[in-house]
A protein has these predicted regions:
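Pore- and gate-forming transmembrane helices of large, multi-pass membrane proteins
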Residues: 289, 340-370, 718-747, 766
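Transmembrane alpha-helices and their membrane-interface boundaries in multi-pass membrane transporters
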Residues: 305-306, 321-337, 350, 354-412, ...
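Alpha-helical transmembrane helix bundles of large polytopic membrane transport and channel proteins
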Residues: 85-204, 505-585
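Juxtamembrane segments of multi-pass membrane proteins
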Residues: 424-545
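Signature of alpha-helical transmembrane segments and their immediate interfacial
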Residues: 2-42, 394-448, 461
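Extracytoplasmic
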Residues: 160-277, 282, 562-657
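Solvent-exposed, non-transmembrane loop/terminal regulatory segments of multi-pass membrane proteins
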Residues: 34-79, 183-193, 422-424, 441-483, ...
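Hydrophobic transmembrane alpha-helices and their membrane-interface caps
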Residues: 285-331, 665-713, 741, 771
Length: 784
């Protein structure tokens, strides 16, 4: 950027100040209105790579997985007979929850006896028909009725058992129940209470189906607030509640972040006030404080022109770049207070500031090549923020009132130009590079999404407690995805048949066992009808005779005899819900919705399955969800993004060399960011802290400030002209520390990691820029 252009633009702004400010305010208003269109996306899907559709399918499938898509609440009491009180509390909690937040998952077991037996005709395959013929033999009917009498005279006849014995005197229900994948669908509920109760009667399980995705962080937080409020209201002092589920993970993150930000904002604002009051001492601080707000408005407004939906997590990480945008304004402020004319200041300070802007922008520009949408959004936000901050600093702020007052105290300054001492600089850079290489081989890099979560240890502990009482639901799940539920069921049957043939030892639970195809149902019904036409009258007569012989009325087995007489309609899925299997259907089959047009059918397997062994057409529509599979696949994709780091470094070094056109000066200016990296890696190696995604997100701020300071200080040393650079470096570093470095005190792992990286990066960067760089230079003409 040429000096005459900036000086000429400044002269125009100074001459047409009213018009210039009006244009700036109009532009700001337009971009602020555009920013109001922004729709923050709290979903984590933006961090899944574009070229990994399998990851997106896994993430969406997690929403329908029982282990993550449901919310499990374990209610516990030591009270004798306390299960009844727990059931009353659970009913009250369900009544308190708004229907648009969650609904209770009802009883999966204890289906209706008559309606369940009505499914038998649809399941009468060859094996069932053979058993049916054996069970209806004359002698076997007599034996079965006698056993029924014995059961009715025992304690087994209490409650629903009577209905089962009347509806199925011949013990045929096993051919229906054996098809139910109840071991995968959920815990069996108590027939009286309607909730699953542990064997000791001390635990009761309430299962909720949230109305929103677990990726919707704000909705998950509202749901958990409502659940905890309801538990506090309805649980007696001797009762305890334990909540486990993916929505709790999301809510804990949101709540911890909100608490951290609330606690740290006060100290950050206090730090800003102290820094400005002690080191700036100017009414121009008002303009400095407005720079981040202006830059953020321009950046957000510009991004909404590309897409109104922006990742909240990406913008949260990108907000750290606001500190670099303010850095330009701080340097301009102290340079203007040096006592020289504005034109001289602009000619002197604009080139290094512009070079610092280009160096930072080049690093973020490389990130635009990322395959992760959130990283590209972060890069674009950073580019727009840096551009707005630089433009404000060199064009608008120099003509703002009070911005250049009061003059700085005049100190004796060495204005003799200096040049880097080659041996000293090369020795320092070589040593730092070797140190960074050695430390990086020691530091553990952990880009796991788990490092972004709060309270993971407690959440895992609570999950183990739930498993100890109710067993594990960490099944291996296959998700068959199609456009319609009909296609999903058809492909699910094909997948189930193939797996039973390829992996006979892999236990499979699938809805297709109780939801036969139209052809299967018709063939089975034909067998049933042929049997009832031929044997029905005989069976009814033998049952009536045996009933009277053993002391029953002739109509005691009317539910079963009516089944033999009644015509059988075509199979209708409503028959499953009539039998009390609706919740099981909802667990396994998920119809398309307005938000997600994909139908999904779940198949549960006892062992991990390799879907690649299926036919290509089936394998393409089937996703395997083994425990930890999503995280493993995501880590593989994120590791591929590491290639962008050396590219960003090379881009920054190339621009530095193009600016200084001298290897010695380029290496000298690169010392502050190198020292920052070395200090961060040294701290991590000594403490055992890994380099996480959040730490990587904070790196651009530290390296951006360090690069800016290295360029500006090197420029001043080489030119011999100083315009308040030392104070500008200290102020910009301290404001960044108070604004972002205090995040090291946060409880959320991601925020804490960001704060620690910024803290240790800035600790060493300031003394290196202000003390070490001058020591590595010598006055021209003198020997090192």
């Amino acid at each position: 950027m040429g000096k005459p252009f900036i000086v000429g633009l400044h002269c125009w702004m100074r001459t047409h100040r009213v018009l210039g400010f009006s244009l700036v305010l109009v532009c700001w208003a337009v971009f602020a209105l555009l920013a109001a269109r922004m729709q923050p996306d709290s979903s984590s899907l933006a961090f899944f790579p574009d070229d990994a559709p399998q990851l997106h399918r896994m993430a969406k499938a997690l929403d329908v997985s029982p282990a993550s898509g449901l919310l499990f609440i374990d209610l516990y009491t030591e009270r004798h007979g306390g299960k009844y009180a727990l059931a009353s509390a659970a009913d009250a909690m369900v009544g308190d929850l708004p229907s648009d937040m969650a609904e209770r998952v009802g009883a999966v077991g204890m289906p209706d006896a008559r309606a369940l037996m009505a499914l038998l005709p649809y399941f009468t395959d060859e094996a069932t028909l053979a058993h049916l013929q054996r069970a209806t033999a004359d002698a076997q009917i007599d034996t079965s009725v006698r056993a029924t009498r014995d059961n009715l005279n025992s304690l087994l006849a209490a409650g629903p058992a009577q209905e089962w014995l009347r509806a199925d005197p011949l013990g045929l229900r096993q051919h229906v129940l054996s098809r139910l994948p109840v071991e995968h669908a959920g815990a069996m509920p108590d027939p009286v209470l309607g909730y699953p109760v542990s064997a000791d009667g001390k635990h009761l399980l309430l299962v909720l189906r949230p109305a929103h995705s677990l990726h919707d962080v704000s909705a998950a937080a509202r749901l958990m607030d409502a659940v905890h409020a309801s538990m506090q209201k309805h649980l007696a002092p001797d009762m305890q509640g334990l909540v486990v589920g993916g929505h709790r993970h999301s809510a804990v993150n949101a709540q911890v972040i909100q608490r951290d930000v609330t606690n740290i904002v006060f100290f950050s604002m206090l730090g800003f006030v102290l820094v400005y009051a002690l080191l700036v001492r100017s009414r121009g601080v008002l303009w400095l404080m407005l720079v981040p707000a202006f830059a953020a408005s321009f950046a957000l407004g510009g991004m909404t022109l590309l897409s109104p939906v922006l990742s909240g997590l990406a913008l949260g990480f990108g907000a750290s770049v606001l500190g670099v945008a303010e850095d330009y304004a701080v340097h301009m402020h102290f340079a203007l207070r040096s006592g020289q004319s504005t034109e001289n200041v602009l000619e002197h300070i604009t080139p290094p500031l512009f070079q610092g802007y280009l160096v930072n922008a080049s690093g973020f520009a490389v990130l635009l090549l990322s395959g992760i949408p959130a990283v590209r959004q972060l890069a674009m936000f950073a580019l727009l923020t840096l551009s707005a901050g630089f433009a404000l600093a060199v064009i608008v702020l120099p003509v703002c009132p009070w911005f250049n007052t009061p003059p700085l105290p005049v100190h004796k300054q060495n204005t003799e130009p200096r040049q880097p001492a080659p041996l000293r600089v090369f020795a320092c850079v070589s040593g730092l590079l070797l140190l960074c290489y050695a430390l990086f081989s020691i530091v553990r890099v952990d880009v796991s999404p788990r490092t972004m979560g709060a309270g993971m240890a407690q959440l895992q502990k609570d999950g183990e407690k739930l498993k100890a009482v109710w067993g594990s639901r960490d099944s291996n799940i296959l998700v068959v995805e199609c456009k319609t539920t009909t296609e999903a069921l058809a492909n699910g049957r094909a997948v189930a048949d193939a797996l039973r043939r390829l992996e006979p030892d892999n236990k499979l639970g699938t809805l297709t066992d109780v939801w036969p195809s139209q052809e299967q149902a018709q063939a089975n019904v034909q067998r049933w009808q042929a049997f009832t036409r031929a044997e029905g009258p005989r069976v009814r007569a033998l049952l009536a005779s045996a009933a009277q012989r053993y002391g029953f009325t002739a109509e005691v087995f009317a539910p079963f005899t009516q089944l033999l007489e009644s015509p059988v309609a075509d199979f209708d899925p409503a028959a499953l819900r009539a039998a009390g299997l609706g919740e099981m259907v909802d667990v396994f089959l998920h119809a398309p919705t307005a938000d997600d047009p994909t139908a999904r059918l779940l198949l549960f397997t006892s062992a991990q399955t390799d879907v690649s062994q299926l036919e290509p057409a089936l394998a393409a529509q089937t996703t395997a969800l083994a425990p930890g599979e999503l995280e493993t696949t995501l880590l593989q994709q994120l590791n591929m993004e590491k290639r962008l780091v050396p590219l960003a470094w090379l881009a920054c070094l190339a621009l530095l060399f193009l600016y200084f056109r001298d290897v010695r000066r380029t290496l000298l200016a690169s010392l502050p960011p190198l020292c920052s990296v070395a200090c961060i890696l040294a701290w991590m190696s000594l403490t055992g802290h890994p380099l996480t995604l959040a730490g990587m997100a904070a790196m651009p701020l530290v390296l951006g400030l360090a690069a800016d300071h290295g360029i500006v200080v090197t420029h001043d040393l080489v030119s011999g002209v100083k315009m308040g650079v030392e104070r500008a470096v200290v102020v910009s570093s301290l404001t960044t520390f108070t604004g972002m470095g205090l995040l090291a005190l946060a409880q959320h792992p991601a925020l804490k990691a960001m704060g620690e990286v910024i803290f240790w990066g800035l600790i060493v960067e300031v003394p290196v820029a202000l003390w070490l760089l001058p020591k590595l230079c010598r006055v021209e003409g003198k020997q090192a």
